[in-house]
């Protein structure tokens, strides 16, 4: 990688991390209801850092809802438009050490079964490396390839094939 590419990649990661910050509004305490203890669990993932992402944010936070990363034909290189989402998922993992994610790599139907399984794995590894590069821990990430076995679209057209060239980020609880 030449220096210009590294500089552009570093700038993209910095912008992506800045885009994932969450504004926290100060709310005065209204009623002293039942207290929650630090480290209490919500959905199996410890809620150890108040004011940061919680498991419910996986459904409500727009950058965390982006859980499908698409790829170009026969490529395992990440597109720039997915860098912000990847940085957001990395931040979630940093804030939640008990969280785990699977990178499920997929390919379209073109190519042999073996080739597509390898391509799906390379794509999953590319997303995993990007998440780790943004601060996610390798111990929190698993990669599995389904190759062409789990298409989201069954037509034989470029539009359909482009939907099948993907990595799905699936959160699990250990």
Annotate each language-model stretch with its function.
Residues 1-9:
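Bacterial N-terminal signal peptides that target proteins for export
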Residues 81-88, 114, 118, 122-126, ...:
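Extracytoplasmic/secreted proteins, especially bacterial periplasmic and envelope-associated proteins
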Residues 75-78, 107-111, 148-151:
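Solvent-exposed loop/turn segments at secondary-structure junctions
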Residues 21-100, 174:
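Periplasmic peptidoglycan-binding/tethering modules of Gram-negative envelope proteins
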Residues 97-106, 121-152, 165-174:
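A non-catalytic structural micro-motif
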């Amino acid at each position: 990688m030449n220096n210009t590419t590294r500089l552009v990649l570093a700038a993209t990661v910095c912008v992506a991390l800045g885009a994932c910050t969450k504004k926290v509004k100060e709310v005065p305490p209204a009623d002293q209801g039942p207290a929650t203890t630090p480290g209490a669990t919500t959905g199996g993932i410890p809620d150890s850092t108040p004011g940061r992402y919680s498991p419910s944010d996986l459904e409500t936070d727009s950058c965390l809802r982006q859980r499908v990363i698409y790829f170009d034909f026969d490529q395992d290189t990440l597109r720039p438009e997915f860098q912000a989402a990847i940085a957001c998922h990395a931040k979630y993992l940093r804030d939640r050490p008990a969280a785990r994610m699977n990178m499920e790599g997929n390919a379209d139907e073109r190519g042999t079964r073996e080739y597509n399984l390898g391509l799906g794995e390379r794509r999953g590894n590319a997303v995993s490396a990007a998440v780790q590069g943004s601060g996610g821990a390798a111990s929190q990430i698993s990669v599995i390839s389904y190759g062409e076995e789990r298409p989201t679209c069954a037509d034989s057209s470029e539009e359909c094939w482009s939907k099948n060239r993907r990595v799905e980020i699936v959160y699990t609880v250990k």
